[in-house]
Curated annotation (Swiss-Prot):
The chain crosses the membrane at residues 12-32, 38-58, 77-97, 102-122, 134-154, 158-178, 217-237, 239-259, 285-305, 309-329, 337-357, 363-383. This is Staphylopine export protein. SUPFAM superfamilies: MFS general substrate transporter (SSF103473). The gene is cntE. Belongs to the major facilitator superfamily. NCBIfam families: opine_export_Sa (NF047574). The keyword Transmembrane applies. It is found in: Cell membrane. It is a multi-pass membrane protein.
Length: 397
């Protein structure tokens, strides 16, 4: 196999699956364990939120450091730190979980940037979007079984079993990760050590100065708000009104993400051009899904479950499309930091899906909250349509 499916890249995708397997378990186990330990929802929220907040803050730093040091060297250091963080889970309580979540957030920022930038730099231009899509696919696969494993461990009421599983994942991921490469020989990164027009702090201002980054970032934030609102509140929504099973809904969504990222990856543009009709078509799926979720009790369970497929398809296509586009149009100098800032937009959006939409649902109810989500997506659909197709600048090559 060639291109994004070549063996060196398949090893990277497998490493991605292994790396995110622990988090798929922890995302469910930590709240359950925290409740058993008598923690309030606020404390549990702080512990869980520390992961994504830390990842969001460190992504631009990660892009800059990777540009100077190289993705392989950074990856190997991060794998060791990640292993230490996972081992902490096996021997501590909630306070240790907080420290480990912060460490995991740092690791995730550097890990995802190392692999995505390494894939972008190593693949030919026509295969970039496919490579990023496959990375996203393998990062999602653990969500198919991780929650079930977490619930099983929690039901067993055996913290030693939890420690064994997490430490096993930590060690196998580290050992496997030390053997992966992006190519026969890691590219020389000395030419990337240039004087940056911004640093890891001032880079945040570039979000508003760079029109391409601003446009793509806003689209990613709004779409991620909907994704976050769905994953956070659909369980409460379905339980409170009793019209469907949230577990079935989220499983269907995860299957749709995995299937779409594999079977539709070749349809994702990878030419450095803006495709308004394509973006409107993809985002329209999310609008329909948001409205169906809002009227879930009225439309029935079957149609409600069908909306999970639309959400999964959108989730699978929006991120790699925008990442691939920005890899072409962003300026070469500082591109890695700017890509890190864009990826942080996805983190921010998902966190806002809970932090922002939670109070809104308290005020107006779940139905209107999801209607508002759909209206927000209509706004970014209009943005996508009005944005003129932009040819790839030669300076971005």
């Amino acid at each position: 196999m060639k291109g994004a499916m070549a063996w060196p890249f398949l090893r990277l995708y497998i490493l991605t699956l292994m790396f995110f397997s622990a988090n798929a378990i922890l995302n469910v186990f930590i709240p359950l364990r925290g409740h058993d330990l008598g923690a309030t929802n606020t404390v549990i929220g702080i512990v869980m939120g520390a992961y994504m907040l830390t990842a969001m803050v460190f992504r631009p730093w990660a892009g800059q450091i990777i540009a100077r040091v190289g993705p392989i060297k950074v990856l190997r250091i991060i794998l060791i730190i990640n292993a230490i963080a996972l081992i902490i889970y096996g021997f501590t309580g909630l306070e240790g979980y907080f420290v480990a979540r912060v460490m995991q957030g740092v690791c995730t920022a550097f890990f995802s940037m190392s692999l995505q930038l390494g894939i972008i730099d190593a693949l030919p231009e026509e295969h970039r979007s496919e490579g990023v899509s496959l990375y996203s696919l393998f990062s999602t696969i653990p969500n198919l079984i991780g929650p079930l494993v977490a619930v099983g461990i929690w039901n067993a009421n055996n913290i030693s079993l939890f420690a064994i599983v997490i430490i096993f994942i930590a060690l196998t991921t580290t050992f496997f990760g030390y053997r992966v490469t992006f190519a026969e020989q890691e590219p020389d990164t000395s030419d990337k050590i240039e004087k940056m027009p911004f640093n890891a702090v001032t880079v945040f201002a570039q979000f508003f100065k760079n029109k391409e980054l601003l446009n793509s970032g806003i689209i990613m934030i709004v779409a991620s708000i909907v994704f976050g609102a769905v994953s956070t509140f659909v369980p409460l929504y379905t339980v409170s009104l009793g019209f469907a099973n949230a577990g079935i809904f989220l499983t269907i969504q995860a299957i749709a993400v995995v299937a779409a990222r594999f079977y539709l990856r070749k349809y994702i543009p990878s030419d450095g051009m803006w495709h308004p009709k394509y973006m409107v078509s993809v985002l329209s799926l999310l609008v329909i899904a948001s409205f169906v979720v809002a009227f879930g009790p009225q439309v029935g369970a079957i149609i409600f479950y069908g909306s999970a497929i639309l959400i999964g398809m959108t989730q699978a296509m929006v991120y790699p499309t925008l990442t691939s586009y920005l890899s072409f149009v962003l300026p070469k100098v500082g591109r890695n930091m700017l890509l890190g800032l864009f990826i942080a937009c996805a983190d921010l959006g998902i966190s806002l899906g809970g932090a922002l939409m939670g109070p809104i649902s308290d005020l107006v109810g779940f139905k209107w909250m999801y209607l508002i989500c759909g209206m927000l997506v209509i706004v970014i659909m209009i943005m996508s349509f009005l944005k003129k197709p932009t040819p790839r600048p030669a300076s971005s090559l």
